[in-house]
């Protein structure tokens, strides 16, 4: 028997709702804090802001609201979902609100988080929310593996989401250590 999936909770202890918007806030004070926001990637020729960043401090501006789009039903720990910045935007930029993992960045030797993803497609736009032992959550980027390997432990293909410094800004990226510990605050 697999245990019942546990719903992901917001800062008020309420279950996340796919129809609501949330800010992703870092756990930590001062420079360890800071909300996640949509910003322009350096050297990007995209017509819309296409980078996923974190403000440099907890006294910075409020982050860009997101919504979580599960494959079905509610929003549970360890389940694949898409993440979309939930902001009004011009038609051209709609796909530039959906999170995905970019190609390998040679300078950082890892993949950076960007927008331009898809919803419900078997590609690099899937994430999971995993609970930390004490407080808060981590985000994982997970390939859509149900086809590749039916008996593999699912998370072995997932990578933790953390931060690299890009042109003085904190950019979300896949990391081996120091993942970003976050909470979800309803907007």
UniProtKB/Swiss-Prot annotation:
<dbReference type="GO" id="GO:0019828">
    <property type="term" value="F:aspartic-type endopeptidase inhibitor activity"/>
</dbReference>
<feature type="site" description="Reactive bond for trypsin">
    <location>
        <begin position="67"/>
        <end position="68"/>
    </location>
</feature>
<feature type="site" description="Reactive bond for chymotrypsin">
    <location>
        <begin position="111"/>
        <end position="112"/>
    </location>
</feature>
<keyword id="KW-1015">Disulfide bond</keyword>
<dbReference type="GO" id="GO:0004867">
    <property type="term" value="F:serine-type endopeptidase inhibitor activity"/>
</dbReference>
<dbReference type="GO" id="GO:0005773">
    <property type="term" value="C:vacuole"/>
</dbReference>
<feature type="disulfide bond">
    <location>
        <begin position="142"/>
        <end position="158"/>
    </location>
</feature>
<keyword id="KW-0646">Protease inhibitor</keyword>
<keyword id="KW-0062">Aspartic protease inhibitor</keyword>
<comment type="similarity">
    <text>Belongs to the protease inhibitor I3 (leguminous Kunitz-type inhibitor) family.</text>
</comment>
<comment type="function">
    <text>Inhibitor of cathepsin D (aspartic protease) and trypsin (serine protease). May protect the plant by inhibiting proteases of invading organisms.</text>
</comment>
<feature type="disulfide bond">
    <location>
        <begin position="48"/>
        <end position="93"/>
    </location>
</feature>
<dbReference type="InterPro" id="IPR002160">
    <property type="entry name" value="Prot_inh_Kunz-lg"/>
</dbReference>
<feature type="glycosylation site" description="N-linked (GlcNAc...) asparagine">
    <location>
        <position position="19"/>
    </location>
</feature>
<dbReference type="InterPro" id="IPR011065">
    <property type="entry name" value="Kunitz_inhibitor_STI-like_sf"/>
</dbReference>
<keyword id="KW-0722">Serine protease inhibitor</keyword>
<keyword id="KW-0325">Glycoprotein</keyword>
<protein>
    <recommendedName>
        <fullName>Aspartic protease inhibitor 9</fullName>
    </recommendedName>
</protein>
<keyword id="KW-0926">Vacuole</keyword>
<dbReference type="Pfam" id="PF00197">
    <property type="entry name" value="Kunitz_legume"/>
</dbReference>
């Amino acid at each position: 028997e697999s245990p019942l999936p546990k719903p992901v909770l917001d800062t008020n202890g309420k279950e996340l709702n796919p129809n609501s918007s949330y800010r992703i806030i870092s756990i930590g004070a001062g420079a360890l804090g800071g909300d996640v926001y949509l910003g322009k990637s350096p050297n990007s020729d995209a017509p819309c802001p296409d980078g996923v960043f974190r403000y440099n401090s907890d006294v910075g501006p409020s982050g860009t609201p997101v919504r979580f789009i599960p494959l079905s039903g509610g929003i549970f720990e360890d389940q694949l979902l898409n993440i979309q910045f939930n902001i009004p935007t011009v038609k051209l930029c709609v796909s530039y609100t959906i999170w995905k993992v970019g190609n390998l960045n040679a300078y950082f030797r890892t993949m950076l988080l960007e927008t331009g993803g898809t919803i419900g497609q078997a590609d690099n736009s899937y994430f999971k929310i995993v609970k930390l032992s004490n407080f808060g959550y981590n985000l994982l980027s997970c390939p859509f593996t149900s086809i590749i390997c039916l008996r593999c432990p699912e998370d072995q293909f997932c990578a933790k989401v953390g931060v690299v410094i890009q042109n003085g800004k904190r950019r979300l990226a896949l990391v081996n250590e120091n993942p970003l510990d976050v909470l979800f605050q309803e907007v």
